[in-house]
């Protein structure tokens, strides 16, 4: 009987640990999502200023459609680069958490 109770307690402990690990993993994913949303918000705020240029029909030339996209991509790359170390660290943490969760799930009957 003692052996069964010990095994059952360990199984319950592992399940509780698994729930804690899954919650930590969800929080890490949430942090990554928050960074993505912050980048999107910054880019959305920049769009009006990216479209405004003194060049265009007023100077006798039509506006270049690719110019806006070039400015947009350049700003997106710069904003993302500022957050890249944090994004990379969270991505590595998420991979470690997912691996640990998978390993623990294999030990739970």
Residue ranges of predicted features:
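Amphipathic protein-protein interaction modules
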Residues: 54-86
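Short, charge/polar-rich alpha-helical segments
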Residues: 7-43, 79-91
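Long amphipathic alpha-helical coiled-coil segments
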Residues: 42-47, 73-109
């Amino acid at each position: 009987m003692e052996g069964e109770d010990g095994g059952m307690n360990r199984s319950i402990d592992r399940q509780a640990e698994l729930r804690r690990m899954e919650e930590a993993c969800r929080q890490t994913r949430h942090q990554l999502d928050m960074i993505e949303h912050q980048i999107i918000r910054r880019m959305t705020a920049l769009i009006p200023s990216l479209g405004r240029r003194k060049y265009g029909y007023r100077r006798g030339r039509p506006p270049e459609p690719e110019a806006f996209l070039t400015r947009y991509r350049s700003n997106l790359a710069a904003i993302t680069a500022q957050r890249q170390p944090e994004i990379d660290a969270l991505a590595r943490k998420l991979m470690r958490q997912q691996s640990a969760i998978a390993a623990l799930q294999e030990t739970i009957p």
